[in-house]
Amino acid sequence: ITFFFARLETETSIITRRGVVIHGRAVLAGRLASTMRRKTTEFIGNNIKYFIIAPLLTIAESSTELLLPFLMGRIVDDGLNAENSRNVLYIGLWMIGISLLGLLLGIFSARTSAKASQGYGFNLRQAMFRQIQTFSFADIDTFSTASLVNRCTMDIRQIQDAVMQIIRMLVRAPTLLIVSMVICIRLHAGLSIVYWLAIPALLATLFVIMRITKPFFSAMRTRSDALNACVQENMIAIRVVKTFVRSNYEKEKFRRANDALTDTSIGASIRIALMHPCSTVIFNLATIALYWFGGHLVGSGALLSGALLSYVAYLNNILFSVMMFNMVLTRLSRTKPCLTRCMEVLNYESSIRSENGGEPSSMQGAIRFEHVSFSYPGAQRSGSVLEDICISVKPGEFIAVVGPTGVGKTTFVNLIPRFYDPVEGRIFIDGKELRTWDLGSLRQHIGVVLQNNILFSGTVRDNLRWGAPTATDEELLEAARDAQAHEFILHLPDGLDTVIEQGGTNVSGGQRQRLCIARALLKKPCILILDDSTSALDSITERRIFDTFYQKYRNTTILLVAQRISSVQNADRIIVLDGCRICAVGTHAELLQNCGIYQAIYDSQQEGSEADGGRRQ
């Protein structure tokens, strides 16, 4: 497995830490061969016994098949030609017994091979998922979500099937090939010229077919990713599609992606389909030649007729072994893109790694940005999202972040839990540089309510306990009460045991936001980040939540990203972002006097409120 996978990867590519694709042949081949040797041992794991037993059973099964042509020849020569019915019965019973033994060995061989390949796939899938869990937001952006899902499912299934085929056929084929060739030479060395001519012809034919088919396999994986991305995007945004009556557009987009995949698959299938008729022609020509020359030998008495029948059967074994080799290589050619894509994930070095700088028992919540600049990977042309950000936040401060759309408010708060690392500058928490914090400890002290409120399939209790698995029901209800979710939870059909559907589709947007806030509060974080997390709430509910924060969470540093001035006017300080920079910092009253941007936002919202009031009147 290591040898074949490493050899197939000679011309592949890997993604380095910075997302740069490096191409190479000799150096990369050695690097990947080393990686695959290490990974293969890791993925075999506790299934090593199946990887040992399965080939042994396959060899035993192949041995029974090698005995049958010999016994068939003996039936003809010692039974039928000698008119000895007793020999026919005796040898026939032996053939039946050996066939049944081969059947049992085949069943056990297939079973152990399946366990070996399934265990290999299981371990590979676990390793892939563990690796993805270490990815930062930037790393996830490097790979598309649909592509990662495809790699963890369909690609690993292809690799799993390849492992199964290697265990079965790559042991079976050489056994049949070598033993059959030796027997043929012992039966009649002169007739061996037939398979010496047939094998090169068969290999040349199969090589040409594989060569013209290989590019289609890589294209199939790429187009399968595109199709999965199309389906995933449509399912996630189905409400938007329905609202804007864009079903026909989405159908056409899916049809194009489906057509591209289908055309590529058909192209590969047509070329693969050439193997059978071409191989059949070579098989038949070899058999005809063998009967022609063998018939003359039988007529001259140089060869027994039973031996000729055995010779034909062994020749078929030889040619079939070559076909099996080709089937394995074809499978590996199809698996190569899948393996490449899985190795890209497994070899990817996350851009954000924990430095294991210890696990502080507590955090005060002081935050300091020193000349921080940030731009998203691949977005250098469009400029920085944040530039030269300098700000200090005291422990327990309630800080609001406002500004026009697209100025980097979400990016600003996403840097604090290290979802991304700044391109320039440094961030400190409690005087300790952010990169030196243990990543798990850092995020354990920070509660985040994202712009997109994500709930998982499961009960309300399961979702609330996401950040605090040992929390009691009393603690759950207390956090829900602080987030103004207590009342509607109690009115749900099963209360805390009410099942939340995937994505929280069976609760409203406001309920989803409140559940996410309660989930974050349950962590008892030292720093709480609310990224536009009350936008779906009415002003009364929002005010109650913030009143609770001011009264009960005075020791928690809170950063609130908001669009509504009414949401932030009671904050200790308000940061105004504009043009990727901090243009002003102050209280609500100070900014109304000194910051034109803040005043413009405030005035526009006041005018909007008055206009809405006039229309209602």
Region roles according to the model:
Residues 84-90, 183-197, 267-340, 345-346:
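Helix-loop-helix
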Residues 82, 118, 126-150, 154-156, ...:
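Short intracellular "coupling" helices and adjacent cytoplasmic loop segments at the cytosolic face
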Residues 1-7, 14-68, 72, 80-94, ...:
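Membrane-integrated ABC transporters
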Residues 46, 50-63, 98, 102-104, ...:
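Transmembrane helices of ABC transporter permease
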Residues 23, 28-32, 361-617:
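ABC-type nucleotide-binding domain
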Residues 46-48, 134-138, 154-163, 167, ...:
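An intracellular "coupling" helix at the cytosolic face of ABC transporter transmembrane type-1 domains
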